């Protein structure tokens, strides 16, 4: 498929379609002999399914005020590895979920998982909430520490790491959902935020939101709908679905963890989810904003992470290699800053520039030479996080 880069609007302000990105542009911005212009695609309705922090989805939410009645959205970074383990250690179907260590040692929160798959393979991962306060925290290095816990290490010793990946996660849940229908379009999946964070699962919810959109629009177009309308029927169908019920029952999970902390929040959620089945007669709200949670570096304790041992823990470069991503060198860097002065003039002295650490693939670096510090982007290391 082709990635959409811009929105196309009708004269009445409704979404008319999208424009795909140009291809064949050199790193200097010149057209190469392989140049292909973007295509303007029109549709009666456009379904936006870009995933977490989709650039068009963010634009639509802001333009149409879709989140004015919602609490602020919350995000996390999920890091995952696939391992081949010895047959005698394989427990097909075993599922382990965890919270607390190692993140709680640095005042952060999140969760972990370990799934025994087929063919002696294990998938493991760590989700780091992006409301942590210590700017020296590194999600990648926290994952490497996580694997040294005895309950995890017992399965990995003698095994081999096969793959690595990372992804941003929209995890605000039910309370942070924006209005998902707009004139000429619909938001689905993580573009809206349909992840069930209590279960650390979002594939089934994203699929269901897309199915509701397809059924709603098919019926409308079959009946002669000319397009461009704000389909309130989608919202109605969403409210009548099991998706709405599931997300509503998990509505207190994230706010409880953020407001009460890992242990008290965990106790509350155990009662809410397992005893009351998400049917408590009140709703917790979390009005905090993730990006405002960092303390200034001078007030935070620096974190020294152990070196990779090459057995259980690894460095970023060898991990990026296992993602099997590759980018054409001679193309524009799309990781552009609105204000290039912020990393060195604001973030570095105030926050020790956390972008050096919170991007798992190590895209941003600040090397120093005789001329001073330089904020450097290693585009070849980029994997599609959308942080």
Where are these regions (language model features)?
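Predominantly flavin-linked oxidoreductase catalytic cores and closely associated redox partners
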Residues: 2-154, 194, 212, 216
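Glycine-rich, charged/polar anion/phosphate-binding loops
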Residues: 63, 99, 108-112, 169-176, ...
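Alpha-helix capping and helix-loop boundary segments enriched in small/acidic/polar residues
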Residues: 70, 134-137, 176-179, 197-205, ...
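Mid-to-C-terminal "cap/lid" subdomains and adjacent gly/pro-rich loops that border
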Residues: 77, 81-104, 113-116, 120-126, ...
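Short FAD-binding loop at a beta-strand-to-alpha-helix junction that anchors the flavin cofactor
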Residues: 118-120, 179-198, 357-365
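Flavin (FAD/FMN) cofactor-binding core of flavoprotein oxidoreductases
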Residues: 154-175
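Active-site-proximal substrate-binding core of FAD-dependent oxidoreductases
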Residues: 193-199, 205, 211, 215-262, ...
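Ferredoxin-type iron-sulfur electron-transfer modules and their immediate structural context
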Residues: 241-375, 386
């Amino acid at each position: 498929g082709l990635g959409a880069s811009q929105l196309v609007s009708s004269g009445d302000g409704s979404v008319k379609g999208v424009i795909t990105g140009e291809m064949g542009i050199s790193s200097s911005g010149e057209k190469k002999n392989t140049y292909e212009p973007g295509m303007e695609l029109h549709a009666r309705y456009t379904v936006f399914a870009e995933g977490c922090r989709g650039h068009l989805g963010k634009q639509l939410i802001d333009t149409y005020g879709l989140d004015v009645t919602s609490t602020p959205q919350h995000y996390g970074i999920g890091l995952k590895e696939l391992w081949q383990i010895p047959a005698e250690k394989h427990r097909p179907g075993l599922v382990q979920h965890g919270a607390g260590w190692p993140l709680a040692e640095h005042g952060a929160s999140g969760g972990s998982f370990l799934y025994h798959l087929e063919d002696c393979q294990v998938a493991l991962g760590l989700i780091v909430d992006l409301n942590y306060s210590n700017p020296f925290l590194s999600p990648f290095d926290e994952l490497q520490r996580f694997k040294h816990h005895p309950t995890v290490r017992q399965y990995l010793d003698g095994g081999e790491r096969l793959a690595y990946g990372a992804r941003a996660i929209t995890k605000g849940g039910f309370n942070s959902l924006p209005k998902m229908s707009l004139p000429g379009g619909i938001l689905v999946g993580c573009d809206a935020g349909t992840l069930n964070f209590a279960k650390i699962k979002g594939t089934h919810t994203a699929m269901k939101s897309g199915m509701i959109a397809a059924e709603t629009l098919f019926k409308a177009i079959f009946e002669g709908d000319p397009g461009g309308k704000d389909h309130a029927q989608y919202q109605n169908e969403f409210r009548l679905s099991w998706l709405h019920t599931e997300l509503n029952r998990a509505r207190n999970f994230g706010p409880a963890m953020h407001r009460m902390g890992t242990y008290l929040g965990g106790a509350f959620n155990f009662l809410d989810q397992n005893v009351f089945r998400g049917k408590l007669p009140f709703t917790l709200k979390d009005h905090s904003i993730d990006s405002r949670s960092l303390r200034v570096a001078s007030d935070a304790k620096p974190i020294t992470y152990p070196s990779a041992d090459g057995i259980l823990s690894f460095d970023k470069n060898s991990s990026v290699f296992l993602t099997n991503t590759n980018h054409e060198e001679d193309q524009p860097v799309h990781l552009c800053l609105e204000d290039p002065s912020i990393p060195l003039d604001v973030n570095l002295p105030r926050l020790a520039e956390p972008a050096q650490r919170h991007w798992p693939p190590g895209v941003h670096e600040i090397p120093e030479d005789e001329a001073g510090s330089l904020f450097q982007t290693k585009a070849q290391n980029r994997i599609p996080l959308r942080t």
